[in-house]
Design a protein with these regions (language model features):
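Non-transmembrane, aqueous-exposed alpha-helical and coiled segments at domain scale
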Residues: 1-271
């Protein structure tokens, strides 16, 4: 008979174990949800400091107002009010490279730079030099630096200094956060303007410094946003706006002449 080993949940007639512990007696009422999420992903119990940083990330990413993920969830619930799971899933599926995906993109970007750097800097001057080289390379390649800039918080994202402070208080400021902070200091020399380090980016740096799998960084952002979407749906039930959003489009659309698609000439980049 085939076997399917797992260190996660397992059940017998009289007990349920999770991560090798009795679920009812050792986990329920003893382990917070954020701590448990970290533990499930890494199969090691986080320290109190790691838990504090991780839960600060979850709080930072839970909700950011009427973003596309929130609007889509509300509209999906308007269309199918009998399917709360569909409304939640619709919002989560909207998480991507523009919204929520920056957490993963920034964590991976910083990690790749650090892997290529060899010996890591030991002081701010060294980090600034590495950051300057990194920003210049991105500029020459005509690429953005993930985590740099925000369409609303143009003068500074309040989540960024707070998360950096929490990580420092817990002794968890690692190379990813150090490089990200240095990028914030030196990028004006290359770009000629000052952009904020955004909250999604600093969350990616913090998650990477916690040693969490890079492949799951977006999953943690989605975990956080799940709570936010539940809040959006709860508010929609009491104070609905989705129908107004729908009607604002439905009542204000206007017919225009067709705009036939023309493929680009052969040899040019496709759309």
């Amino acid at each position: 008979m085939p076997e399917y080993p797992t260190a996660l949940g397992a059940s017998s007639k009289d007990a349920i174990t999770l991560l090798g512990h009795d679920l009812a007696n050792d986990v329920m009422g003893e382990v917070g949800f954020g701590e448990l999420a970290f533990w499930l992903a890494t199969q090691r119990r986080p320290t109190p400091g790691e838990t504090r940083v991780f839960e600060a990330v979850l709080a930072a990413l839970a909700d950011h107002g009427y973003t596309p993920t929130a609007i889509i969830s509300r509209l999906a619930h308007l269309s199918a009010p009998d399917s709360v799971q569909g409304a939640l899933a619709a919002g989560l599926l909207a998480g991507g490279s523009r919204f929520l995906g920056v957490t993963e993109d920034c964590g991976r970007f910083l990690h790749d730079v650090l892997e290529d750097a060899g010996a890591l800097p030991t002081d701010d001057a060294g980090w600034d030099a590495l950051a300057l080289e990194t920003v210049r390379r991105q500029r020459e390649a005509k690429k953005f630096v993930p985590g740099l800039g925000h369409h609303v918080h143009k003068d500074g994202d309040p989540r960024t200094p707070r998360l950096m402070a929490i990580a420092a208080e817990e002794g968890i400021t690692g190379p990813h956060l150090a490089l990200f902070a240095a990028i914030g200091r030196v990028h004006p020399e290359v770009l000629g303007k000052t952009l904020p380090l955004n909250g999604a980016g600093v969350c990616g740096a913090a998650l990477a410094d916690l040693g969490l799998p890079l492949e799951l960084l977006r999953a943690f952002a989605l975990l956080a946003r799940t709570a936010g979407l539940i809040g959006q749906l709860a508010e929609e039930l009491r104070h609905p706006v989705a129908n107004d959003i729908f009607l604002s489009v439905d009542l204000n659309n206007r017919p225009v002449d067709p705009d036939p698609y023309e493929p680009p000439p052969v040899g040019q980049d496709s759309l």
